[in-house]
Amino acid sequence: VQEVIVQNVVPNERSSFEKPSVETMRRTVAMARVALPESVSVQVPPNLSPTRELLDCGVDDLGGVSPVTDDYINPDYAWPALAELVDVADCAGVPLYERLPVYDRYLPERFRRPGFDGDAAPGSWLADPIVDALDADDAHGERFRGVARRDGPLDVSAGD
């Protein structure tokens, strides 16, 4: 398990329940952080949750957000603007950068970012077609490798 997403329920016209309180979300995020190994990230979706109010409970990942696409799972809830995400990340000390859907520890060593100081997951975690895409000698492979190194085009970190 590389991450656990603590996603609140957002009621709609077909539901009869209420959105959980901020305090309930804070307790849930904190319990996830305590219960999970340190190597497992705790994520909250910033378009569905009061992210700023949850960061100090153990959130270390803001999720797969996009400045150019909608949230396909929750299309009624737009992603926060990139500037807002930068501000939220800065306030929490959580780096904001473009990343692959797989965390560094699961990447083969040759694809990990320089300075990776975590514990590599044992074994092989990526299917051959994914490794082939990362290895590709074309613009796509180059882009994937750049994102893995954290020097992708959407790098907005301040020196991570």
Predicted regions and their residues:
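Auxiliary Fe-S-binding modules of radical SAM enzymes
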Residues: V1-D160
